[in-house]
Amino acid sequence: MTALVSVMNKHAVVIAADSAITVTTPYGHKVINSANKVFALSKYHPVGIMFCGNANFMSTPIEVIVKLYRKQLKDRCFATISEYLSDFLGFIKNNHYFCSAEMQNANMENEIENFYTLILKIAANTANEKKSLFLKEFILQLNSIVVNSCENCTSFQNFLEKDFVQSIKGHCAKIIAKHEDVFGDNAPLKRLFIKAFAKFVAHGNSNFANETQIVVVGYGDKEIFPSLRSVCLYWGFYEFFRYNSYISAGITEDNSASICRLGQTDIINTFINGINDNLKKALYDIFGNFTSQLKNLMINNVDTQYSKDIINSAIDEGKLVDTLGATLDNIIRDTSIAPWM
């Protein structure tokens, strides 16, 4: 379990995190249960930072990056929390992601290999392991990514695909050479693979294994109420830094309070709402089944079709479940959430 929570109102902001982090090593993933994930981003101003997910970014611990940033920030401040986050991201990029060129190259080749494995599995499952259909499905999957019009991730809004393709060509060639049984001498397929990977990288909804959620929260120098900005960090490759905006929240004249949950939110939801999400869903299912059975029982125990039609139209299982949900949400809001605010 790894989770973050922020509670803000017009008076203050409170942030908290559990102590579990995931550390990625060349040999796999390791979970550490005694880590600190909440830090002051500035020694002089009310700005904090917390994270969840992978504890390392490009092999460097997030905690180390935060301490280095805080040291160089000194007593400087920014007008808004958004500017603090932008400066922090710029600090990471300007320091070459705190890793060598060799590490960046190796990480990119690992991402290309993961992409190949993803497409391979989808194609194999779709083709039902029939070799005659596999290559066709492999090409179809690559083409579907190329033609997908999904919005780009935050850092690739002005993405120049041809520049990225040029920078990864050599790395893609290494991965393609490892899988000669699939690519062979098929030059168009090789070009399609490279283009599809570039599109996959740019798409905002693409998933990568080593994700770190960063949350910056507090008061900008020109902000009288607290605000929160968060991004998901993935990787850096020379001038290409992949990250995506996640949750944004702020207190305003019209919005007097906010609760933000990140990471594995099921435990936090249980704590805040007073009921587990799965239990809530089970309650709706049980109530829906009960009303359906009751309706059928009543219909089966009347003689005339007119009476059956009246019962059938009077008892709407869907509306009853919706009414239960609305009632329960009101109770949760009044008894569990409102006291926090």
Go through each PLM region and give its residues.
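N-terminal nucleophile
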Residues: 1-341
